[in-house]
């Protein structure tokens, strides 16, 4: 059980849900420059497994690291933190 707590958990925004049972999540983080101290924002996209196809574009979701599910999928959807507002 303690092994599960060591898996990486990220929170990000869904940017694509066009694939079946797969979402693309954009995770934005900040790093501080070692010399100047300025915070630099950078982002990375992860593909995550969404078994029920419940996440939509714009949702804020939490994803967790898991075993390789395909050539590019290494994460699975844990929960939808905030649903997107549809105008």
Swiss-Prot record:
Gene Ontology MF terms in the entry: rRNA binding; structural constituent of ribosome
GO cellular component, one term: cytosolic small ribosomal subunit
Matching CDD domains: Ribosomal_uS17
UniProt key word Ribonucleoprotein: yes
Known role: One of the primary rRNA binding proteins, it binds specifically to the 5'-end of 16S ribosomal RNA.
Subunit annotation: Part of the 30S ribosomal subunit.
The protein, known as: Small ribosomal subunit protein uS17
Species this protein is from: Bacillus cytotoxicus (strain DSM 22905 / CIP 110041 / 391-98 / NVH 391-98)
């Amino acid at each position: 059980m303690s092994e599960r707590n060591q898996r990486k958990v990220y929170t990000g925004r869904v940017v694509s849900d066009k694939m079946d049972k797969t979402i693309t999540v954009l995770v934005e983080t900040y790093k501080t420059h070692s010399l100047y101290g300025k915070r630099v924002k950078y982002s990375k996209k992860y593909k995550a497994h969404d078994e029920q196809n419940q996440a939509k574009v714009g949702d804020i979701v939490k994803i967790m690291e898991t075993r390789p599910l395909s050539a590019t999928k290494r994460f699975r959807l844990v929960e939808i933190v905030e649903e997107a507002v549809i105008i």
